[in-house]
Curated annotation (Swiss-Prot):
The gene is ENOD12B. The lineage of its organism: Eukaryota, Viridiplantae, Streptophyta, Embryophyta, Tracheophyta. Expressed only in young nodules. Residues 1-24 form the signal peptide. Residues 32-42 have a biased composition (Pro residues). Keywords: Cell wall, Nodulation, Repeat, Secreted, Signal. Residues 34-109 are annotated as: 15 X 5 AA approximate tandem repeats of P-P-[QVHRTA]-[NHKE]-[KEDT]. This is Early nodulin-12B. InterPro entries: Proline-rich_CW_protein.
Length: 113
């Protein structure tokens, strides 16, 4: 019987250690504690409608156009080359006779009688 009472004693001590609140006021309602911080209030976010602004345009600035001064270049001349002038040799070409078109050949050239 000593082992039975010892096991019951160990059971109760372990129950007190393992259960955090133990056997304290199990059946009572917990005491009211006011909240430490205020609860958040859900307000709809107030967004202003977008305001249409025209694009910003800077006024035109009157600046004179930049003109480059004209550049005077001397005319390009090839350097003189010291070569004797070459004369073209005359080429003799016999005058070309064109054959008659849409005509009968002359009688002396005609071999058909």
């Amino acid at each position: 019987m000593a082992s039975f009472s010892l096991s019951i004693l160990v059971f109760f001590i372990s129950a007190l250690v393992l259960v955090p609140q133990g056997f304290a006021e199990y059946y009572l309602n917990p005491a009211y504690r006011p909240p430490q911080t205020k609860p958040p209030v859900n307000k709809p976010s107030h967004k202003e409608p977008p305001v249409h602004k025209p694009p910003h345009k800077e006024p035109p600035v009157n600046k004179p156009r930049h003109k480059e001064p004209p550049v005077h270049k001397p005319p390009h001349k090839d350097p003189p080359v010291n070569k004797p002038p070459q004369k073209e040799s005359p080429v003799h070409k016999p005058p070309r006779k064109e054959p008659p078109t849409h005509k009968h050949p002359p009688a002396e050239d005609n071999i058909h009688f």
